[in-house]
Amino acid sequence: FIAFLKKGPNRNQSKTEADSLQKLHLAHLGRMYELGFADISGPFGDDGEIRGITIYNVPTIKIADSLANIDPMVKSGRLQIEIHSWWAAKGFGLR
């Protein structure tokens, strides 16, 4: 499953609050990777509506959605999640 991390409706945090949320967000993504729930995560290099992606390696979209929505950035409303079923073409994987 691929999760698009998009700008959320609540982006009016102070710089201190936003920096704190960013640290918690990165810790959350690190845990998802360490626990084997996510294969890769990362931001986009522009300031567009879609801020980044996470590719979840879990059996159901419900699990992917639950994991994505416990991200502190999502819980705060700074980001919102859009999840889709996704798979690599046969024979292609992450390197």
Regions picked out by a protein language model, each given a short descriptive name:
Residues 1-95:
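Conserved, structured core segments of small domains
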